[in-house]
Amino acid sequence: MIISASKDRADNMSIFLQKLIVETKWLNHLQPTNEDARWSRISFDVACPPHQAPSVKSLGITSQLTGSRADFILLDDVEVPGNSMTELMREKLLQLCTETESILTPSDDSRICFLGTYQNSFSIYTRLAERNYKPFVWPARYPRKTESYGGLLAPQLYEDIEQGANPGECTDPDRFDDED
């Protein structure tokens, strides 16, 4: 399940995933082989045993979650300036986000993953650790002072630094370069 601040944003992620399945050779096996499988841009199945719920479904954060079930929930940029300006708005948003826990299937493999950018110093992302999530930060460049991240720097980046990555270098050169 993909949840974003807006339904459009979540739909775009769903469309992107569907495109990856079709166009990436090593993901082609995920295309459904059954004619009855769902294959719309906002809700589709991958090649797997039949299930009542679609394999992938996109929703906006204020959409109705009741009745949905998911093994993996991706909350992608649920916090935006328009829904996080005030403390009350952030509390409501955090409550909506944690409601996803009730639709997560009870399995050792089930996961909830947040991807997002802090919108202000009171971001809901800073409060996820209080709710037993393991947050980490992945900046575009290796930091000069890792301690300024309060222990939240991504574990992979700590390893890279220990292995010689230099402060100021891009953490993901395929995505960012010195022009970004």
Short names for language-model regions:
Residues 8-11, 36, 45, 71, ...:
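Acidic-enriched, low-complexity/disordered segments with a strong bias for Aspartate over Glutamate
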Residues 2-4, 57-58, 74, 113-116, ...:
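A structural signal for short, well-ordered beta-strand segments and their strand-loop junctions
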Residues 3-8, 61, 78, 117-120, ...:
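An acidic- and aromatic-residue-enriched active-site/binding cleft used to recognize and process polar
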Residues 83-180:
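Non-catalytic, compositionally simple segments
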Residues 12-20, 69, 73, 92, ...:
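Alpha-helical scaffold elements adjacent to nucleotide-binding pockets in ATP/GTP-utilizing enzyme cores
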Residues 2-65:
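Conserved nucleotide-state-sensing and coupling region of NTP-binding domains
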Residues 41-99:
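Conserved RecA-like ASCE ATPase "motif II neighborhood" in helicase/translocase motors
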